[in-house]
């Protein structure tokens, strides 16, 4: 089970298995950290700023005022033409026909190795007039498929979720 809660400039992401928290990530105005198997990792400097900048309910809204973003062209993503937008170390792909975000590639470094993580967004469904991808496929060396079972908007979110 994965639970993601967001508010302006705040994000809480928790992954549970058999009722136990496996990993958790918190971002708020003051800090950002990740917990995994009881170990806490605090983010500082550029990592903290990047995480805080992305901690929005709808990250795409921040793109409207981002002077660093650039349209690099149209690319084919899984058979669909998509606008490619370069945003720092990430490239965002939006379907030319639907306007939906269909993929995101991020340049990352882990243990001294540079790699590209690509995430695909599929099966968009309507929730209270907004569209959300119900299928997310992450390629991080292995392919991980996530299926959304429920999206709630403006329900059950408190300040305590972001501490």
Question: Which functions belong to the PLM regions below?
Answer:
Residues 1-38, 70:
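N-terminal mature ectodomain segment of secretory-pathway/periplasmic proteins
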Residues 6, 26-27, 76, 94, ...:
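Generic beta-strand structural signal
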Residues 6-8, 17-19, 78, 87-89, ...:
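A generic beta-sheet turn/junction motif
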Residues 8-10, 66, 80, 131:
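Extracytoplasmic
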Residues 9-13, 33, 52-55, 126-129, ...:
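Short, surface-exposed linear segments at secondary-structure transitions and domain or protein termini
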Residues 18-21, 40-42, 100-101, 110:
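Short, surface-exposed beta-strand-loop junctions and turns on beta-sheet-rich folds
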Residues 26-89, 109-114, 163:
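Flexible, processing/modification-adjacent segments and terminal tails
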Residues 80-162:
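Gly/Pro-enriched, hydrophobic low-complexity segments
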